[in-house]
Each structure stands twice: as C-alpha cells, then as structure tokens.
C-alpha cells in the first residue's frame, strides 16, 4: 500500500491542504479562507473539515489511506509537543493544536513552524536540495523564515528562532501586531505591498494601477508589478521602495548566516525573475561577503505556494 500524508499550510489568509506521497508529489489539494479572527476550536474544525472534504472528493479515507497529518503553522511552534506557543497574527497562545486535532482526525497529527516546514521541502526535493546551510523567507500575510543550518533545522530557544518578520528595519516605523515598531513584515510582506499599492492608488487617480484594477480592494502585489512593467511611475516607486526594504532584511540574514541559498516563497515570489532582477543588484552591493569566491544565491522556492503543503507533509514523513 502506498504511503500517503496530508500536509496543511495554515496561513493568515488561506488554509491549504494536500495529499502528498513520500517523494513530495501532491496528488490533490484544496484551500479555504481562514477568515480570522475566530476561536481556536472553530479553526481546528475548519482544518478537519477541509481535509475531510479533500479526501472524500478524491476517493480517499482518512482512517485507512492517510498515515498522518502535518500542520505548518506561523509562530513559535514546539514540534515535539505539538504546541503553538505564540502566533501574533492569529492571536493565539499555548495552542495545543496536535492534541486537539488528533481527537478530530483519529490519526497522528504533527505540527511545525510553517517556514521550517517549507525549508524542509526545499532541502529534501527543491531548490536547496543538497545544501547544508539554507534559508527560506516567505512573503505572505507576514514574513516567515526557516533555517536549515549545518544539516538540521534550527528551532532556537523557546522555538522562536528565525522569526525574521520581527527584526526591525525601520526605527520607530509602522506598528506591528507583535507590539514593536518597524518590523520587517510591515514593509516586506505581500500584505505590506498590497497596502502600499492601495495607498498609492488613492493618492494618484491618474495611475495605470486603476486601469489594471478598477476595484481598489482587489489590488495586490501582482497589480503593482504589472503596472511597473508597463512603465507606470507610481507603481515603479511603490515596487522599488518595497524591494529596498526586502533587500535590507535579506542582507541582514545573509550577513548573519552566510547560507548557500536563500529561497523566496509566498505570494510575492510568484513574480519570479522580475523580483530577482530587482533584488540581486541591491544584495550584491550590501552583502558583506561580496568579494568572496562563493556567493549566497537568491532563488525562488521550487514549490512556491505548495512548499507549505509539501513541507508539512514531510514533517509527518520524518515522524513516521
């Protein structure tokens, strides 16, 4: 019998689940809106209902066909005990997600930080395959980070290692959900780029952004890049400012860890080469090891939006 696992990518905007095999192949997947805020128990039921419907719609039975369920969650995650100690974007603390979900599923459930799950996927089968030192930075609702250092996942004390979204890159800057000001994710997340794009649209009714997206509520990172590529000055300024902040945070990480590879994931990474072409010159200028023979490579995560699903499933594989 083929071994199959469910991987769940628990995001602030969407919950995505997929059925995955040992090699990281996704057989099927499905997603629903997270619709925060809500009580923990309600979100747990949403996760279960999503996985149950995914299996039923594709001819699988959770009890008989699935080995385990892996959850990739933002925040400080104790993978050994299956507890999310803190998740500022969800507003949860001491969330005993493993224990609670196992009661619903009736099979083993494992939980890991979502960015750690994503770097596991990239190291095992993605664009960091074969690396002993690699990072992933996910640009979504917030900014997440995962590190594979000297051949193993780095969790840190209190399971709060690589919360890169909460390094400060702008003193006394924008207020973050964590309580600090000027955090990386307030400037470099997909949400930040969306917010800045919408602000620019309000300030510049003449911008091409309006022609590409007449409904400002639907404006997002893609719209900003599309307008920039068409020569719109307003969009170009928005994107260039975003890139400067993103490069600032990435160079800080590169100078601390000197990884072989930094993988970029999350919604903004869908811009692929356009994103890399803007980033690389700034990083080349600021990287402390810019004169070294071997340089850190900035790449788009192979699995991109699927990295969370595959990585979460691989957490289950590692515990099988």
Please provide the spans of the model-predicted regions:
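ATP-binding/phosphotransfer module of carbohydrate and carboxylate kinases, centering on a glycine-rich
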Residues: 1-68, 78-81, 99-107, 121-131, ...
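A charged helix-plus-loop insertion that forms the helical arch/lid used to bind
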Residues: 82-93
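General beta-strand structural signal in soluble alpha/beta enzymes
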Residues: 109-113
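Catalytic-core segment of enzymes that process non-peptidic bonds
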Residues: 148-149, 153-154
